[in-house]
C-alpha cells in the first residue's frame, strides 16, 4: 500500500508537469508578444485604466444612490411612525372596557390595514407594526406583531425614551430580507408602550440592483468601445512606425531607394519627410563612399601593378651592385646594404598592397591542401625567430605531439602565423611570447600571447584595420607595413575561420586563429580560450624546460636561414 501511494503521488506530479511546462511556455509567449507589440500595450493599458475608472465611478455612484434611497426611506418612516404613534395613542386611550391585548391588536390591525407588506413589494411606505408593553414584576410582557424581529439594541434606545431606527434582516410570514426597523415610545395611558414599524427594503434593493446591473452593462460596453477606440488610435501611430521599421530594415539590407510614403501634413507626415531626407542623405553619402572606395582600390591596384616593372628593374640592378659590394669602399658598401634592405621592405609593401587589392576585388582564391599545421608554425617561427633572438625574447611553444592535419592554403596560413608572431615580438617589451596549438574534432586553434603593453578597450577591433598602429612612435623590429593583420583576417575569413584579439593595458595581448579541419566546415567554437584563464609568470624557468625542444628546433631553423 505504501508503494502504490507513492506511485499515485508521482502520477499526480507527472500529470502536472506538462501543464506547468505549458503554462511556462504560454507565459513566455505572452511576454514576448507584450514586449514586441506597442499596440497591444496601448490597448491593454487603456483597458486597465478604463476598468479602474469605471469601477471607482461605479462604486461611488452606487454608494451615493444607496445612501439617497435609504435617506428617503428613513424620512418616510419617520413621518409614518409619527402618525402611527398618534393612532396608537388614540386607540389605547379610547375604551377602558377593552383588554390590553385587544387594544394592542386593534392598534396593530388599524396601522397595517392599509399597508400589506406581503403584497406591497413595489409600494413605498409598506410596513408591519409591532407593539410591546414590557412586563413589570410578575406581570408578563404584552405584545402584538413579530416582536422577535426587533433587535435588542434598538429596544434599548426606545426604553431610554429615544426614537431610533436600525437596519436588520427580518424573517416574517410574509417577508424575508433586509428591512428598516424604526421605533418610538408612546405617551398613552399604558406605561412604557413601545411602537415599532418594520419597513421592507425590497423596492430599494431592487432599485439598487437594477442600477448596478445597468452600470455594469454600460461599463462593459464602454470598455469595449474604449478598447476599440484605443486600437484604432494606436493603429494610426503604429502602422507608420512599422512601415518605417520595415523600410529601415530594407534600407540596411542595401535597398537604398526605399522611401516612406507621405500622406497629409500631420506629425506622421513630417516624420516620413524627415526619414526620407535622412535616407536620401545616407544614400548619397554611401554612394559617394562606394565610389571613393572603388576609386581607391582601383588606384591601389593600378599603382601596385605599375610599380612591379620598375621595381623588378631596380631590384636586378641593386642585386648586381650588392654582389660586387666587396669591391666598393665601406661607405658605398653600407649604402648598398641599406638600398637592398629598403628595396626588400618596399617589395613587401607592394606585395601586401597587391594582396589587399585582390581581397577587395573578391578574386583571392585558396590553394587548399592537407598539411600538418605544426609544420606551418615551425616554418613561421623559422622566418621570424631571428627577430626574437636579436631582441632577447624567449618564444615558448606548446603544440600537440600528434599531427594536426587540416585542409588549408599553406602559404596564407603561414603568413597569418608569421604576422601574429612578429606582431607579438614587436609589442612584448622583452618579455616571453607564448604560442599554443590545440585541436578538437572539427577545428584547430593557434594562440599567440605576449605580456607587453596590451590593448586598450576597443582596440581589439582596430588592430585589424589597415595601417593602424596603437603607438606610432614604437619601432617595429619586423619592419612591417601596417597591412599584416588586415591581410591576416581576410585570409582567415577566406578559410571560413576566425581571427580574434584580446588585450588589457599592462597585461599583454592574445591573438587566436581558429580554422576548420575540413574545408567548408563552419567554425562555431574554438579549442582554446580567448582570454587566458591562468596567467603564469612568463619568466618561469619551468616553462623554458618544458619547451626546450621547441626552442632548440627554432635555433636550428634560424641557423639554416642564415
UniProtKB/Swiss-Prot annotation:
CDD domains (alphabetical): HAMP, HATPase, HisKA
Compartments in which it is found: Cell membrane
Entry-linked Pfam families: HAMP, HATPase_c, HisKA
Gene Ontology MF terms in the entry: ATP binding; phosphorelay sensor kinase activity
Organism: Mycobacterium leprae (strain TN)
Residues covered by region (Disordered): 526-562
Keywords: ATP-binding, Cell membrane, Kinase, Membrane, Nucleotide-binding, Phosphoprotein, Transferase, Transmembrane, Transmembrane helix, Two-component regulatory system
Topological relation to the membrane, as annotated: Multi-pass membrane protein
Chain's role: Member of the two-component regulatory system MtrA/MtrB. Seems to function as a membrane-associated protein kinase that phosphorylates MtrA in response to environmental signals.
Ranges of Polar residues composition bias in the record: 536-551
Domain Histidine kinase: 302-519
Reaction catalysed by this enzyme: ATP + protein L-histidine = ADP + protein N-phospho-L-histidine
EC number(s) on file: 2.7.13.3
GO terms under cellular component: plasma membrane
Keyword Kinase: yes
Biased composition (Basic and acidic residues): 553-562
Protein name: Sensor histidine kinase MtrB
Gene behind this protein: mtrB
Predominant localisation class: membrane
